[in-house]
Regions:
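Membrane-interfacial amphipathic/re-entrant helices at transmembrane-helix boundaries
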Residues: 1-19, 47, 57-63, 89-94, ...
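Residues that define the loop-to-transmembrane-helix transition and helix capping
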Residues: 2, 36, 61-62, 92-93, ...
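Membrane-embedded helix boundary and interhelical linker motif in transport proteins
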Residues: 7, 29-77, 81, 256
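Helix-loop-helix "hairpin" substructures at the membrane interface of multi-pass membrane proteins
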Residues: 12, 135-213, 236-242
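Transmembrane alpha-helical segments in multi-pass inner-membrane proteins
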Residues: 16, 20-22, 58-68, 189-199, ...
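Alpha-helical transmembrane segments within multi-pass membrane transporters and channels
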Residues: 23, 57-101, 108, 241-246, ...
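Hydrophobic core segments of alpha-helical transmembrane domains in multi-pass membrane transport
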Residues: 45-50, 68-74, 101-108, 146-154, ...
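Transmembrane helix-bundle core of multi-pass membrane transporters
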Residues: 85-160, 187, 252, 257, ...
Length: 290
């Protein structure tokens, strides 16, 4: 039974890790925290289920692609229209703008899709496979597969591609990058759009696990932020490890103690890390040398 709980926790941790990756990217490149991440999770789940699955009767892959594309467009538009005008202001001004945009997305979802929760059975229904006596649902396998693919692909792009070099140069010094001819505003917009795509994928993968509601992404966005702090503020490998650790910790502790305290446990883990290891599991400086 405990093994089953651990697998479920790691699957949820992989979702937290995707959101945490978006937080880490935005922080490293734009020096802000995107507190709208949870609402991007929510809005993408609504668009995916209500518009593309139920409305247009698209298959899972096409619906996921279009939902992610809509989130990317929203993220890029926010960066070019709002953040580009605020980047010379104090940091908290840009951060507050993400809070406002998140509230806008949540209310927009409520207006368009209504207050009633939506149910989506997923592409595999309730199908599962037994591995060593542990039942793993096909949806959990999909979550692990998508998360691993994204993480490996992201590492290869950042490490070996010209796009990765451009993004790293922009993250290190925007002014120098601009002098070198790098279109900094376009890179920033692309970074924010990518973070929104990661949040969208998290929402799409979550949709079959829970009812789709206007509140479904709020805690996920916060826990993604917590995962990034646990892993090391701005550390990309740390964000992955922090997400998995957070999912494992909250699910296992909820099983051993009480599910009532599941969310509280996640933030208790954060407090413990802030006291014992405030720099996180993999500090950003160490991650950059990796």
């Amino acid at each position: 039974m405990l093994a089953q709980v651990i697998v479920s926790g790691l699957a949820m941790g992989a979702i937290y890790a995707l959101v945490a990756l978006g937080h880490a990217f935005v922080w490293k490149t734009m020096n802000i925290v995107n507190f709208a991440a949870g609402e991007f999770v929510t809005f993408s789940a609504f668009i995916f289920v209500a518009t593309f699955i139920n409305g247009f009767n698209l298959n899972f892959l096409l619906a996921a692609f279009f939902a992610a594309a809509v989130m990317a467009a929203l993220g890029a538009a926010f960066s070019r229209i709002v953040f580009a005008r605020l980047q010379n202001q104090r940091v908290f001004v840009a951060i507050i703008s993400t809070v406002g945009f998140g509230l806008f997305l949540k209310e927009l979802a409520r207006i368009i899709y209504g207050p009633q929760p939506l149910y989506y059975d997923g592409p595999f229904g309730q199908g599962a496979v037994s591995l060593g006596g542990v039942m793993i649902t096909y949806q959990q396998i999909l979550i692990f597969g998508v998360a691993i693919t994204i993480m490996v692909g992201q590492y290869l792009v950042l490490r070996y591609s010209m796009l990765g070099k451009v993004m790293r140069a922009t993250a290190l010094d925007r002014e120098t990058a601009a002098l070198m001819g790098i279109p900094v505003n376009a890179v920033l917009a692309g970074t924010f759009a990518y973070a929104c795509v990661l949040a969208a994928i998290a929402g799409i993968l979550m949709a079959p696990l829970f009812f789709v509601t206007t509140e479904m992404g709020t805690l996920v966005g916060l826990k993604g932020f917590v995962a990034m702090i646990i892993g090391g503020f701005g550390s990309i490998p740390g964000a992955i490890l922090g997400g998995l650790l957070l999912g494992f910790s909250e699910n296992t502790a909820a099983f051993l103690i009480s599910a009532t305290y599941k969310d509280a446990i996640a933030f208790l883990v954060l407090l413990i890390f802030l006291v014992i290891r405030p720099e996180g599991l993999i500090p950003e400086a160490n991650a950059d040398r990796a």
